[in-house]
Structures are given as structure tokens and as C-alpha cells.
Amino acid sequence: MAKKTILDLRDEDLKGKRVLVRVDFNVPLKNGVITDDRRIREALPTIKYLMDKGAKVILVSHLGRPKGFQDDLRLDPVAKRLSELLGKPVKKLNDCIGEEVEREISNMKEGDVILLENIRFYKEEEANDPEFAKKLASLADLYVNDAFGTAHRAHASTAGVAQYIPGVAGLLMKKEIEIMGKALESPERPFICILGGAKVSDKIGVIKNLMNKVDGFLIGGGMMFTFLKALGYEIGKSIVEEDKLDLAREIMNMAKERGIQFLLPKDAVVVKEIKEDAPTSIKDIDKFEKDDIGVDIGPKTIELFREEILKAKTIIWNGPMGIFEIPAFANGTRKIAEAIAENRNCVSIVGGGDSAAAIQTLGLEDKFTHISTGGGASLEFLEGKELPGVAVLQDK
């Protein structure tokens, strides 16, 4: 990795120093209880490393999309869970800046951990307000960005603070960038990219950037219907982006010219209306009627994709194969996850978001090389964009 990480620092750079760590503790809550603590667990290596080196660790994160101060989005449940995981009390403050915060930090001992309040309670955070960033930076001697999930945002706590104090990457940030970077730069082949989700428009950048790198694309999810319609198929009332049909044709032609496989589904699970208990049927894609709605890939497609998955040496997967929130339409996503898990000879990378959620639901996390903690950030990374939260860190 071209950026400095905490591993590049000498012990004296950390011992007794105040270190502001941007983490991504944006975890799902139900009635004030954390339903999935993965993001907290992913941050532990960085936090423990800094504690062991005698740093005073000041954690900052957002949670949800608050409108000003909101009691139900305070970080108290996170501090409680983090304390349990570290086996050490984590003091949670009721603010991010100000006298009380400064006083608490001045009382910290080496190896102590403090969690500041939800940074998005301040609108200055998302505006990347320089004065606000300066106040945050004044709390510490060093900045560590370990929040890959927000690295694509230029906010005060993800980018702004690094204008005032030296910034380096944490261990999770390092892992994310190195694993995905290696897959893009020197993949073992065959290298396939599996894309799903509702919209082609969300994945255009990824397709274009990976067009020169992969051996094949496997396309599922709602976006498949834009490609199928572009080829002249009747898709009934399935989701389609009418304004992206020309672009879909252009992408398919580009793949053809370069000899890159571009696999579209052969069949789909079809309903007349999208609801939990809707009667389903399976249809080949050339048999759709005017009132059919495609909601998942069908068994022939699953088998076709599975064959390609089992041959692959590098796999990047982003986006579900159907409307997987509804159990009856989740089979395609489940079977693709199982096929990737079955291939023990490949590097498998899942780009956060819905695909990651599906894998967790299936309990297959340990069968994948890497499940990214960032949905939007991993997409932008795969698009070849420089992430603002990484760009501001010191070069090696």
C-alpha cells in the first residue's frame, strides 16, 4: 500500500500520544440493541494495536443519518459492546468537541479508549467544515482513518482533520485496499465479476473499469432486464432503465469486441405482482408475457453461473441476484453465495452492502476471502476512483 499505516510508525510516535481514530461503527440497531456487530469487530485489530503501543485512543464514528442531536442515535450501545469485546471499559462522551471533551481527553492514561458522540449530530461533519475539522484535529496528535465504509466521503472526520494533523491508515483500511487492489492489479485467472442489484446505472463505472481486467461478467438482479430489453427481449413489467438501453448495448458490444464473456440469465423467477406470498413461476427469458415481473434468476441460470464460478480463480461479487429481502425471491442470491463458497481455490471478494448481508444471513462469512465493510466505498474503489478518505493520508 502506497500510504503510511500505523505499522509504519515507530513506537515513540504512539506511546503516550493522543490518536484520533475514525472508525465505522454505523451498525444496525433495533430498539437500542445492536443486531450485527461486525463493523465493531472489524475495528478491533487497530484499536488493540494502538492500546498495546500505549496510545490514548479517541474513537470517532457516525451512526445513521441523524437530523441534529437524536437520543436514539447516540453511540451508547456501541460503547457497551466495544467494552465487552475489548474486555476493558470504553468511556463514551456526550459530545465530539468542546470543553468537556478536552477535559476528559487530558485525563486519559496510556492505553485508555474514549468514544466520542455520533459525529453526524453536527451538520459541519458532512459539509467538511474547516473550522469543525480543526476543532476535532486539536483533540489529538495523530489521525488514523480505519473507516473504509466512509472513505468515499470527504467529510470533516474522514478527510478534513488530516489537513491539520498527520494522517495514516488503520489495519482494516490497509486490508481492504490491499486485498481489492491486488485483485484488480494482478488477479489469478480466470477472473470473473458477478454483478446484481436493481440498477445498471449504479454499476456502469465498475463495468467500464473492470472491462480491461476481467475475463467475464455474470449479470443478475434487476439490472439484467435493462440488458435483456436492449437485446430486444420482452421483459413484461420487470424493472428497466429506459434511458440506459443504448449504454447497455454499448457495454455488450465492448465486451464482444474484447472477447470478454458477458453472461446474461437464461431464465427467471416470475410473478404478476411483487409481494411476499405471490405465486411464482419459472420462465425462459424469451417466454415473458406483458404482465410478467422478473424477481430472481432461475435454475438454468444458477447452473450456468455455478459452472463459471467453480472454474474461476478470482471472483468479485457486488449486488444480489433477485429481490432477496423477500424469501421466495432469494434463492438465486443464496445459490450464487453457496457456489462461491464451494470453490476453495479462488480469491473471493464481496463488495459490501446487500451481497454481504446475504452471506451473513447464510452463515458463510468464513468461506469468503474478503467481505468488504463498505458498500459505496468498495463500488467506487472498483470503479478506479481515488477515495477522499485515503487520498489525504501520508504517502510512504
Swiss-Prot record:
GO terms for cellular component: cytosol. Monomer. Substrate binds at residues 24-26, 39, 62-65, 120, 153. The keyword Nucleotide-binding applies. It comes from the Bacteria. This is Phosphoglycerate kinase. GO terms for molecular function: ADP binding; ATP binding; phosphoglycerate kinase activity. Belongs to the phosphoglycerate kinase family. It is an enzyme of class 2 (transferase). Keywords: ATP-binding, Cytoplasm, Glycolysis, Kinase, Nucleotide-binding, Transferase. ATP binds at residues 203, 294, 325, 352-355. GO terms for biological process: gluconeogenesis; glycolytic process. It is found in: Cytoplasm. It comes from Dictyoglomus turgidum (strain DSM 6724 / Z-1310). Pathway: Carbohydrate degradation; glycolysis; pyruvate from D-glyceraldehyde 3-phosphate: step 2/5. It catalyses: (2R)-3-phosphoglycerate + ATP = (2R)-3-phospho-glyceroyl phosphate + ADP. PANTHER family: PHOSPHOGLYCERATE KINASE (PTHR11406), PHOSPHOGLYCERATE KINASE 1, CHLOROPLASTIC-RELATED (PTHR11406:SF23). Its EC number is 2.7.2.3. Gene3D superfamilies: Phosphoglycerate kinase, N-terminal domain (3.40.50.1260). Pfam families: PGK.
